């Protein structure tokens, strides 16, 4: 979910990593050698994979506060790889704009893993900026990836990406001060004027407003996008919308400045735990579904270690620790069974393990490309900056 970590914080997980290192190390030994080439646009980068087991240094770029404390040191202990874990992604667009000049030259700024939203991964695949995964190096991904995430339209064989976490965008309310907010349309009710926050994410906020208008985001035309933006603009200009936020809406809910917000499922889990008055509500129109994916950029200096990392975090025991900390939807099968024993409350939470019936009216992030994308982003940015 793009931009989801800006300005916010996460509760620290309470369970330390418990991993059977022998199993992990055996799987890591499958990392492959050889070479592959990646072409796209005007870029052609030759990638040479390290031979044998992973070693050396691995540089990872991820969003802030998106991993528990134990996973990185456990990976280092299991593999001997030295990890430089950078929490330097605060916006998909900002990070891409920073990296694009390097990627166009077949360089990655020393990084071997990025974690980016589906739409950005799709863009980078088309540009030829990503390496294809060697499936023999990531057997746990093949074995344990949730069925619902195995064949996204932008990467149907998961040749270039492995989900890091998934989640939902919907409504978080103060159930005492906004008891009757159940839909996106309810956020436009004048009784809540000046008490509503909207996300500053065009690919989540605008499609949700489309759903309020009865439009299927997956079939939306440019006119549908513009009509929804116009509705948001009117609400912003009238003062109905208090402000547009990243996940700093958490502070607004906590201090009472907002009574209802468009927000993310993982934040809702954490907010509810700290304040029982706050509650996630699945919009009657349905939510937006998203994932953020691990990818290996062209020019990655250590793709073997990158694949070893992907394989490691797809061990259910490892992923269970991550899930306990971040509280988003885990992409790994087998995690629920582990948490049923050590954290039953999380295991039964629909926001972490949503059923098909729970998300039946939800929609994936719709595509935006080319001239249409430029027009939509320009129009939405004008509202944000208005």
Sequence positions of predicted segments:
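Mature extracytoplasmic/periplasmic domains
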Residues: 297-360
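Ligand-binding pocket segment of bilobal, Venus flytrap-like solute-binding proteins
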Residues: 121, 197-201, 205, 209, ...
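Periplasmic solute-binding protein
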Residues: 118-131, 146-149, 155-182, 205-213, ...
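Short, low-complexity disordered leader/linker segments with a strong preference
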Residues: 1-57, 386
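A structural signal for short loop-to-beta-strand junctions that line the ligand-binding cleft
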Residues: 49-51, 104-116, 131-136, 140-170, ...
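Extracytoplasmic/periplasmic substrate-recognition and gating elements
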Residues: 263, 272-325, 386
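Early extracytoplasmic/lumenal segment of secretory-pathway proteins
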Residues: 34, 43-123, 251
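Conserved C-terminal helix/tail region of periplasmic/extracytoplasmic solute-binding proteins
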Residues: 356-386
